[in-house]
A protein has these predicted regions:
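Conserved Rossmann-fold NAD(P)-dependent oxidoreductase catalytic core, especially the SDR/UDP-sugar
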Residues: 35-85
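Catalytic helix-loop patch of NAD(P)-dependent Rossmann-fold dehydrogenases
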Residues: 67-116, 138
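A recurrent short beta-strand within the Rossmann-like NAD(P)-dependent oxidoreductase core
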Residues: 163-169
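Conserved cofactor-binding/catalytic machinery of classical short-chain dehydrogenase/reductase
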Residues: 13, 36-39, 51, 77, ...
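NAD(P)-dependent short-chain dehydrogenase/reductase
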Residues: 100-149
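NAD(P)H-binding glycine-rich loop region in Rossmannoid oxidoreductase-like domains
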Residues: 1-35, 46, 63
């Protein structure tokens, strides 16, 4: 329970990484991704947390043929309702945007990270690279953005400290 933990510890900074990436029921994923994030944001606001660092995903922009390449921070958040992960990331980013207006004293750093790669890390995207062939469509770009675990750790450390606030792809 974020209210209990944040209320007991009274941290200056909260780093919120929780998200469901692997397939599960939509209801469970929603409870973790959206309801959990809502509770973290509310608990941070209630208990006077100075800074909230959240990892998001490019999936929040949605999977649309007219998305610009590359996507930048000012592009519209249009997560697809038909894809739970994309829809949930959109909802969380919308909640964060609302909180920036309602609770401006809660500094936010929203990191829109790509697929995380690193030693011992396995996910749906890394599984594609273990197959005998990597599926691609000729003449069709499919841009992926990757980040190494160590680089992400350094970015999170800076975000939790004196780094700038805002949304960063």
């Amino acid at each position: 329970d974020p209210y209990e933990v944040i209320g007991r510890e009274l941290p200056d900074v909260v780093i919120h990484l929780a998200s469901i990436v692997s397939p599960t029921t939509r209801a469970f994923a929603h409870s973790v991704d959206v309801v959990g994030s809502r509770n973290v944001i509310a608990a941070c606001s209630l208990h006077g947390v100075r800074r909230l660092v959240v990892t998001s995903s490019g999936a929040a922009y949605g999977y649309h043929a007219d998305n610009p390449v590359p996507l930048v921070e000012t592009d519209a958040i249009r997560g697809n309702v038909e894809f739970a992960y994309s829809d949930h990331k959109r909802q969380v980013e919308e909640m964060l945007a609302e909180a920036r207006k309602a609770v401006p004293e809660l500094q936010q750093v929203v990191l829109v990270v790509g697929t995380v790669l690193g030693a011992g890390l396995e996910n749906q995207i890394t599984a594609l690279f273990h197959k005998p062939r990597l599926l691609a469509l000729r003449g069709c770009e499919s841009p992926f953005v990757f980040i190494w675990t160590r680089d992400l750790a350094r970015i999170l450390k800076r975000a939790a400290g004196a780094g700038p606030t805002g949304v960063f792809n």
